Amino acid sequence: MNGETPAQKAARLAAAAALAAKTAADAAAKAAAKAAAIAAAAASA
């Protein structure tokens, strides 16, 4: 359709998957940090 070879398509899909995984990992890290901060505040209260 757009002249993309199967290898190019696979590489593009792999890059998109890697970006999605990084985004999910960043979100999980932020959530964990927030939960830890809340737990620390609750423990000190």
From Swiss-Prot:
The modification Blocked amino end (Met) is found at residue 1. Transmembrane segments: none annotated. Keywords: Antifreeze protein, Repeat. Sequence repeats lie at residues 9-21, 22-33, 34-45. Belongs to the type-I AFP family. Antifreeze proteins lower the blood freezing point. This is Ice-structuring protein SS-8. It comes from Myoxocephalus scorpius.
